[in-house]
Amino acid sequence: MQLYAVQQNSIYTLKPNDPEAFYFTPENYQIKADGKMDVSDALQAAINQVKKEKNFGILFIPEGKYKISKTIYVPGSIRLIGYGKKRPEFILAKNSPGFQEEVSIDKGKANYMFWFTSSLVEKGQVPRDANAGTFYSAMSNINLRIEDGNPHAVALRTHYAQHSFISYVTIYIGKGKAGLFDVGNEMENVAFYGGDYGIYTTKASPGWPVMMVDSYFEGQRV
Protein backbone atom coordinates (compact mmCIF):
# COMPACT_ATOMS: atom_id res chain seq x y z
CA MET A 1 0.00 0.00 0.00
CA GLN A 2 1.33 3.44 -0.95
CA LEU A 3 1.40 5.63 2.14
CA TYR A 4 2.71 8.86 0.64
CA ALA A 5 1.21 11.62 -1.45
CA VAL A 6 2.94 11.28 -4.81
CA GLN A 7 1.55 9.14 -7.59
CA GLN A 8 4.07 7.65 -9.99
CA ASN A 9 1.97 6.48 -12.91
CA SER A 10 1.90 8.21 -16.26
CA ILE A 11 -0.79 10.88 -16.29
CA TYR A 12 -0.79 11.21 -20.11
CA THR A 13 -1.22 7.67 -21.40
CA LEU A 14 -2.23 8.62 -24.95
CA LYS A 15 -0.29 10.65 -27.49
CA PRO A 16 -1.55 14.26 -27.38
CA ASN A 17 -2.66 15.62 -30.74
CA ASP A 18 -1.19 19.11 -30.96
CA PRO A 19 -0.38 20.45 -34.44
CA GLU A 20 1.75 23.23 -32.93
CA ALA A 21 3.91 20.90 -30.83
CA PHE A 22 7.03 18.90 -31.67
CA TYR A 23 7.48 15.17 -30.99
CA PHE A 24 10.79 13.55 -30.04
CA THR A 25 10.25 10.39 -32.07
CA PRO A 26 12.57 8.14 -34.12
CA GLU A 27 10.84 9.33 -37.28
CA ASN A 28 11.59 12.97 -36.56
CA TYR A 29 15.04 12.81 -34.98
CA GLN A 30 16.65 9.45 -35.91
CA ILE A 31 16.90 8.30 -32.30
CA LYS A 32 16.16 5.11 -30.38
CA ALA A 33 14.45 5.15 -27.00
CA ASP A 34 16.24 1.99 -25.89
CA GLY A 35 18.46 3.36 -23.12
CA LYS A 36 21.55 2.48 -25.16
CA MET A 37 21.74 5.13 -27.87
CA ASP A 38 23.04 8.49 -26.63
CA VAL A 39 20.38 11.00 -27.62
CA SER A 40 22.01 14.08 -26.03
CA ASP A 41 22.72 15.97 -29.24
CA ALA A 42 19.41 15.04 -30.87
CA LEU A 43 17.47 16.12 -27.80
CA GLN A 44 19.26 19.45 -27.60
CA ALA A 45 18.66 20.00 -31.31
CA ALA A 46 14.95 19.25 -30.89
CA ILE A 47 14.60 21.65 -27.96
CA ASN A 48 16.46 24.36 -29.87
CA GLN A 49 14.25 23.76 -32.91
CA VAL A 50 11.13 24.47 -30.86
CA LYS A 51 12.68 27.69 -29.55
CA LYS A 52 13.91 28.87 -32.96
CA GLU A 53 10.74 28.06 -34.89
CA LYS A 54 8.06 28.89 -32.32
CA ASN A 55 9.86 30.84 -29.55
CA PHE A 56 7.63 28.94 -27.10
CA GLY A 57 5.99 25.55 -27.10
CA ILE A 58 6.06 21.87 -26.22
CA LEU A 59 8.38 19.01 -27.06
CA PHE A 60 6.46 15.80 -26.38
CA ILE A 61 8.54 12.82 -25.26
CA PRO A 62 7.12 9.33 -25.96
CA GLU A 63 7.43 6.45 -23.51
CA GLY A 64 10.90 4.91 -23.53
CA LYS A 65 14.36 5.14 -22.02
CA TYR A 66 16.65 7.92 -23.23
CA LYS A 67 20.36 7.91 -22.49
CA ILE A 68 22.15 11.25 -22.18
CA SER A 69 25.75 12.07 -21.25
CA LYS A 70 25.84 15.86 -21.07
CA THR A 71 23.82 18.82 -19.83
CA ILE A 72 20.63 19.57 -21.78
CA TYR A 73 19.66 23.26 -21.81
CA VAL A 74 15.97 24.18 -21.82
CA PRO A 75 15.41 27.84 -22.79
CA GLY A 76 12.58 30.01 -21.54
CA SER A 77 8.98 29.10 -22.47
CA ILE A 78 9.84 25.56 -23.59
CA ARG A 79 8.12 22.58 -21.99
CA LEU A 80 9.08 18.89 -22.06
CA ILE A 81 6.04 16.67 -21.50
CA GLY A 82 6.08 12.87 -21.52
CA TYR A 83 3.34 10.49 -22.59
CA GLY A 84 2.67 6.75 -22.79
CA LYS A 85 1.53 3.88 -20.58
CA LYS A 86 4.70 4.49 -18.57
CA ARG A 87 6.50 7.78 -18.13
CA PRO A 88 9.55 8.25 -20.36
CA GLU A 89 12.84 8.21 -18.47
CA PHE A 90 16.02 10.17 -19.12
CA ILE A 91 19.13 8.41 -17.84
CA LEU A 92 22.49 10.06 -17.20
CA ALA A 93 24.93 7.39 -18.34
CA LYS A 94 27.52 5.91 -16.00
CA ASN A 95 30.68 7.98 -15.67
CA SER A 96 29.46 10.75 -17.96
CA PRO A 97 32.24 13.31 -18.63
CA GLY A 98 32.18 16.35 -16.34
CA PHE A 99 30.09 14.86 -13.54
CA GLN A 100 32.90 13.40 -11.41
CA GLU A 101 34.43 16.54 -9.88
CA GLU A 102 33.00 19.58 -8.12
CA VAL A 103 32.54 22.47 -10.56
CA SER A 104 34.14 25.27 -8.57
CA ILE A 105 33.09 28.08 -10.93
CA ASP A 106 29.43 27.02 -10.95
CA LYS A 107 26.88 28.51 -8.55
CA GLY A 108 25.73 25.06 -7.46
CA LYS A 109 29.21 23.52 -7.65
CA ALA A 110 27.78 20.80 -9.88
CA ASN A 111 26.81 19.72 -13.37
CA TYR A 112 23.18 19.21 -14.39
CA MET A 113 21.16 16.78 -16.47
CA PHE A 114 18.68 19.54 -17.40
CA TRP A 115 19.38 23.22 -16.89
CA PHE A 116 16.53 25.67 -17.43
CA THR A 117 18.05 28.80 -18.95
CA SER A 118 16.79 32.26 -19.80
CA SER A 119 17.60 31.96 -23.50
CA LEU A 120 18.73 29.62 -26.25
CA VAL A 121 22.12 27.98 -25.71
CA GLU A 122 24.02 27.16 -28.89
CA LYS A 123 27.14 24.98 -28.97
CA GLY A 124 30.07 26.84 -27.44
CA GLN A 125 27.94 29.50 -25.75
CA VAL A 126 27.95 30.16 -22.02
CA PRO A 127 24.47 29.42 -20.60
CA ARG A 128 22.54 32.23 -18.94
CA ASP A 129 20.59 30.97 -15.95
CA ALA A 130 16.81 31.25 -15.80
CA ASN A 131 15.71 34.31 -13.83
CA ALA A 132 12.74 36.42 -12.73
CA GLY A 133 11.81 36.98 -16.38
CA THR A 134 11.85 33.30 -17.40
CA PHE A 135 8.19 32.28 -17.79
CA TYR A 136 6.32 29.13 -18.91
CA SER A 137 9.24 26.66 -18.75
CA ALA A 138 8.34 23.18 -17.50
CA MET A 139 8.93 19.44 -17.31
CA SER A 140 6.04 17.06 -16.66
CA ASN A 141 5.34 13.32 -16.66
CA ILE A 142 9.01 12.42 -17.12
CA ASN A 143 11.33 10.45 -14.84
CA LEU A 144 15.04 11.13 -14.37
CA ARG A 145 17.80 8.74 -13.30
CA ILE A 146 21.46 9.35 -12.44
CA GLU A 147 23.59 6.24 -12.87
CA ASP A 148 26.71 5.46 -10.85
CA GLY A 149 29.97 7.31 -11.38
CA ASN A 150 28.41 10.79 -11.40
CA PRO A 151 28.89 12.04 -7.80
CA HIS A 152 28.54 15.73 -8.74
CA ALA A 153 25.47 15.32 -10.93
CA VAL A 154 22.22 17.17 -10.20
CA ALA A 155 19.11 16.26 -12.17
CA LEU A 156 17.54 19.73 -12.55
CA ARG A 157 18.48 23.40 -12.21
CA THR A 158 15.27 25.44 -12.03
CA HIS A 159 15.68 29.13 -11.17
CA TYR A 160 12.77 30.18 -13.37
CA ALA A 161 9.65 32.23 -12.55
CA GLN A 162 5.92 32.64 -13.30
CA HIS A 163 3.99 29.73 -14.88
CA SER A 164 7.08 27.48 -14.75
CA PHE A 165 6.96 24.13 -12.97
CA ILE A 166 8.16 20.58 -12.47
CA SER A 167 5.35 18.07 -12.03
CA TYR A 168 4.82 14.31 -12.00
CA VAL A 169 8.54 13.60 -12.03
CA THR A 170 10.38 10.88 -10.11
CA ILE A 171 14.10 11.47 -9.70
CA TYR A 172 16.36 8.52 -8.95
CA ILE A 173 19.45 10.38 -7.77
CA GLY A 174 21.31 7.31 -6.57
CA LYS A 175 24.93 8.18 -5.82
CA GLY A 176 24.60 11.59 -7.48
CA LYS A 177 24.57 14.90 -5.62
CA ALA A 178 20.94 16.04 -5.73
CA GLY A 179 17.65 16.02 -7.54
CA LEU A 180 17.27 19.76 -7.87
CA PHE A 181 19.32 22.91 -7.44
CA ASP A 182 17.70 26.36 -7.17
CA VAL A 183 13.95 26.27 -6.77
CA GLY A 184 11.47 28.21 -8.87
CA ASN A 185 7.74 28.93 -8.82
CA GLU A 186 6.11 25.51 -8.33
CA MET A 187 6.73 21.79 -8.08
CA GLU A 188 4.02 19.19 -7.74
CA ASN A 189 4.06 15.43 -7.32
CA VAL A 190 7.84 15.12 -7.40
CA ALA A 191 9.65 12.23 -5.68
CA PHE A 192 13.35 12.28 -4.78
CA TYR A 193 15.19 9.02 -4.10
CA GLY A 194 18.79 8.96 -2.88
CA GLY A 195 21.46 11.60 -3.42
CA ASP A 196 23.34 13.69 -0.91
CA TYR A 197 20.32 16.01 -1.02
CA GLY A 198 16.86 15.96 -2.53
CA ILE A 199 16.98 19.74 -3.05
CA TYR A 200 19.57 22.38 -2.25
CA THR A 201 18.94 25.97 -3.20
CA THR A 202 19.60 29.67 -2.93
CA LYS A 203 16.78 32.25 -3.02
CA ALA A 204 14.02 31.93 -5.58
CA SER A 205 13.94 34.40 -8.45
CA PRO A 206 12.97 37.85 -7.09
CA GLY A 207 9.23 38.35 -6.76
CA TRP A 208 8.28 34.69 -7.25
CA PRO A 209 7.91 32.56 -4.12
CA VAL A 210 7.96 28.78 -4.42
CA MET A 211 5.13 26.32 -3.80
CA MET A 212 5.81 22.62 -3.22
CA VAL A 213 2.82 20.26 -3.37
CA ASP A 214 2.61 16.49 -2.79
CA SER A 215 6.33 15.74 -2.93
CA TYR A 216 8.34 12.93 -1.35
CA PHE A 217 11.94 12.43 -0.16
CA GLU A 218 13.65 9.14 0.64
CA GLY A 219 17.20 7.98 1.29
CA GLN A 220 19.14 11.25 1.22
CA ARG A 221 22.61 10.88 2.76
CA VAL A 222 23.13 14.36 4.27
Give the ranges of each region predicted by the language model.
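Extracellular "leader-to-stem" segments immediately downstream of a signal peptide or signal-anchor
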Residues: 1-60, 68-147, 152-155, 159-167, ...
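Mobile, glycine-rich extracellular loop/lid and propeptide segments
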Residues: 65
